[in-house]
């Protein structure tokens, strides 16, 4: 869509039409002391000057080897991703309300949705959400709408920022949140769910791998949840689905999660995208846009926005959400990422992440002053290590050696004093892991 700003002749004509001489007269009703002062902006720069200016700013950043995750992860992004999403046809998140005019954009959304459905084993995906936290909160709202109940059970293993977002969404509602505490093994035991879920429970929200990296027994938990006629919301790291059972296989009703691991850079925490997939019975209650495939009157394949009567531009305050397509560019990155890896490549990538994390785990827990918090548990990317050493000292020594160390879990939960959350992805080499363990041994 072309955008050409007004020239001086256009501006003069508009001012004459509304009967004023200068744009500043539009603001006469605003007291002068409340008006913005003149902005201290220098004159224009040449391309070379601009490049040098931002290069100087960027040079102040310190590049570190990362062993920290906790929601945002250092994964390799194939060059294919940037090549595709950087095309002018895609370089915007916005889908116009005359959406059928943008067939390429709609097809890319449709392909993304198809891949998310294949990955999760569920029937319908939306066009994406803002991030994992909002996707989780929207899943809770969906469950409340669909069930007509007002009690939500949430695992303590849910990312704490996701939990806070859910609480914010429900702050002025009548919904009740009950926290399911993790066991000493770092998981939610099915007996704990069985004791807490009742006829008033709208949904049970379980994250796997959970915030501590531990993989939950989702099939066993699903059996308990389904026996009580409650909805099961699975919060996932999509990369883990390369090796672990899909939500569709263990009969989850809703699957959500953070899509950053699928081709989006860390970017200091965002922007990324969230994904959501649901069983067919819930698709009318699902938030966000949905692209569908159809044929025109001549039998040609085409794409449309479907089930639009759920949305804000039609339902207004009765809409399922105010989510539109503002995260679609990042979702497109996820689509390209998944397509590029393919089934076998994606599985192999997940296996490499498991292998490298296990290698680091075995090295670290063998050091004096370090031990596993959750022994003999399957984990993905992340693991918790308990230490008798000074954590602040460890972090500072690692920083001096160019390493962003693990997360100090005491800042998240006081029950995890002296505990560190390590993260190891496919980006980390054995040499880097060995260097990490050498520094920890000397700390």
UniProtKB/Swiss-Prot annotation:
One Pfam family recorded for the sequence: GDC-P
| Top enzyme category | oxidoreductase
Similarity section: Belongs to the GcvP family. N-terminal subunit subfamily.
Membrane spanning residue stretches: none
Biological role: The glycine cleavage system catalyzes the degradation of glycine. The P protein binds the alpha-amino group of glycine through its pyridoxal phosphate cofactor; CO(2) is released and the remaining methylamine moiety is then transferred to the lipoamide cofactor of the H protein.
- Species name: Endomicrobium trichonymphae
Which NCBIfam families does UniProt cross-reference here? Answer: PRK00451.1 (NF001696)
Q: Name one GO molecular function term.
A: glycine dehydrogenase (decarboxylating) activity
Q: What is this protein called?
A: Probable glycine dehydrogenase (decarboxylating) subunit 1
Enzyme Commission code(s) on record: 1.4.4.2
Example GO biological process:
nucleoside metabolic process
What is this organism's lineage? Bacteria, Pseudomonadati, Elusimicrobiota, Endomicrobiia, Endomicrobiales
Q: How does it assemble?
A: The glycine cleavage system is composed of four proteins: P, T, L and H. In this organism, the P 'protein' is a heterodimer of two subunits.
Query: What reaction does this catalyse?
Result: N(6)-[(R)-lipoyl]-L-lysyl-[glycine-cleavage complex H protein] + glycine + H(+) = N(6)-[(R)-S(8)-aminomethyldihydrolipoyl]-L-lysyl-[glycine-cleavage complex H protein] + CO2
* UniProtKB keywords: Oxidoreductase
